[in-house]
């Protein structure tokens, strides 16, 4: 009788541990990631092209100097496809990509097949790299970003330049408004 009771208790404890296993596997840091995206202005870059990281660091330094309340940070993804996925699914708002990767993402070509076509906008570019945003990035935020990156200059020159006419990605409306000289309060 004592032996059966021990087996039964062992069975119950094992069953209770196994019943909690799906909960342990379902844990994701999604809530923390959501809070991180809401609290900080994240500028995404990717590890397969370290120049994206260099430019993202410069952009964040500009934001720190001119838009300190944005609490800007660089978020590094493993590759351009991951950045494209985050931008086109509205999980990220800003990213630095090589010009060719940004064009491929905009057209859903090459490694970006199946991504939401035309879901990005350009804000600025520099030395073959483009600062892109999600097409849902608010206009007034894009205006502030454009004001910061176009007007801030240091020993390395301007942070970003206005995208050239040869870039097929449309300019974000907020950045366009800034470049046309419209004041921020005209947008709100």
Question: For each of these PLM feature ranges, what is it?
Answer:
Residues 109-125:
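Short beta-strand->loop
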Residues 52-68:
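Short, polar/charged alpha-helical segment
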Residues 45, 122-141:
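A bilobed periplasmic-binding-protein/Venus flytrap-type ligand-binding module shared by bacterial periplasmic
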Residues 92-113:
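A ligand-binding cleft/hinge motif common to bilobed small-molecule-binding domains
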Residues 154-188:
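An extracytoplasmic/periplasmic, membrane-proximal ligand-sensing/linker region
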Residues 68-85:
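Short helix-initiation/N-cap motifs at beta->coil->alpha
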Residues 37-49:
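Short, well-ordered beta-strand elements
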């Amino acid at each position: 009788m004592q032996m059966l009771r021990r087996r039964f208790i062992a069975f119950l404890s094992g069953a209770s541990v196994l019943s909690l296993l799906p909960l342990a596997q379902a844990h994701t840091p999604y809530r923390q990631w959501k809070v991180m995206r809401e609290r900080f202005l994240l500028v995404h870059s990717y590890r397969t092209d370290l120049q994206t990281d260099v430019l993202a660091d410069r952009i964040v330094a500009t934001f720190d100097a001119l838009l300190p309340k944005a609490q800007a940070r660089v978020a590094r993804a493993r590759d351009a496809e991951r950045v494209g996925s985050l931008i086109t699914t509205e999980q990220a708002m800003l990213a630095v990509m090589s010009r060719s990767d940004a064009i491929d993402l905009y057209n859903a070509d090459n490694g970006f097949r199946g991504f939401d076509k035309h879901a990005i906008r350009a804000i600025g570019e520099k030395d073959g790299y483009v600062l892109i945003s999600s097409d849902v990035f608010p206009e007034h935020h894009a205006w502030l970003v454009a004001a910061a990156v176009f007007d801030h200059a240091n020993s390395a020159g301007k942070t970003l330049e206005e995208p050239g006419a040869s870039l097929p990605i449309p300019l974000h409306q907020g950045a366009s408004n800034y470049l046309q000289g419209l004041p921020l309060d005209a947008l709100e």
